[in-house]
């Protein structure tokens, strides 16, 4: 099931960044294979995170499409995957560290996404998504 597209990722990070981050040759031509891989990763990540929640997974599309917050989260995660998986390294004090070390271009966006997903999982915010008929059926249980 596909929830997001390249244009959704571009809405979060910009088309120039998505093209540059997806092109491992150092150019600025979007690599559709890597973009598809980032979409697959992001969609599976969010689905797996919500699988044991009160929400039905896969998520159901409403009359106006998928919940805009879900689309934003998946798009942000897909863009972060593209950014972190570029294989680019930088030097600091003669030690190579990953560019995606928490100081990268996507770190603030991902911090926001994690906070919002945590709020949805804890019930502090409610998504426009179908709920399971029995949310505890797949969650942990205790028998005495």
Map each language-model feature to its residues.
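Conserved short "hinge" loops at termini or chain/domain junctions
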Residues: 1-68, 125-144
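Alpha-helix boundary/N-cap detector
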Residues: 33, 37, 69, 73, ...
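Ordered, amphipathic secondary-structure segments that act as subunit-interaction surfaces
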Residues: 48, 52-53, 67-89
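Short loop/turn elements at secondary-structure junctions
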Residues: 76-144
């Amino acid at each position: 099931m596909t929830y997001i597209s390249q244009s959704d990722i571009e809405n979060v990070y910009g088309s120039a960044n998505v093209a540059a981050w997806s092109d491992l040759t150092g150019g600025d031509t979007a690599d559709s294979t890597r973009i598809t891989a980032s979409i697959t990763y992001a969609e599976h990540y969010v689905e797996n995170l919500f699988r044991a929640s009160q929400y039905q997974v896969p998520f159901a599309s409403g009359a106006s499409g998928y919940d805009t917050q879900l689309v934003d989260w998946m798009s942000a995660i897909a863009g972060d995957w593209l950014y972190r998986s570029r294989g680019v390294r930088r030097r600091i004090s003669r030690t190579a560290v990953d560019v995606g070390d928490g100081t990268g271009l996507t770190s603030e966006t991902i911090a926001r996404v994690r906070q919002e997903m945590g709020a949805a999982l804890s019930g502090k915010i409610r998504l426009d998504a179908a709920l399971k008929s029995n949310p505890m059926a797949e969650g942990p249980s205790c028998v005495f």
